[in-house]
């Protein structure tokens, strides 16, 4: 009952059969706004479990994908510093829903901008401020989008060239006579 006392929190479990969850840290349970230092980690969460929300707010169900999060919160005398590391692996949108509350955002296009060449979305979202008025910076998200766009633009011509030369594993070198550009009939 002492508001200055601190408690250690350590919860290990699973969401479903294959998705580990860890919640660990220290807090003042009767005055968390004075001091909290806690981490929430979720791994391998199957994204289709969020279909009731994605269908309602994004206008699409989720066909597949996995969610991994590492969320860290520090509160010291009402001052918040938080770091959200989020990885979404192989997100694929499914069928459109008939939601009246969906955001009119191009979610499929936005997803394609956020994905890297391996189909992974990595986001780091810092939040800082007082717990009465937290703010977050979108700069890291914008830079991630720009990096992914540039990577796709740089590799696109090479992917097209690679598609032209399918079966190149059977290609062989052709020897020319010195100073000649004529092909040998056997080539």
PLM ranges: what are they?
Residues 1-126, 143, 164-173:
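Small-residue helix/turn framework positions
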Residues 121-124, 130-137:
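Extended catalytic-interface subdomain
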Residues 136-187:
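Periplasmic peptidoglycan-binding/tethering modules of Gram-negative envelope proteins
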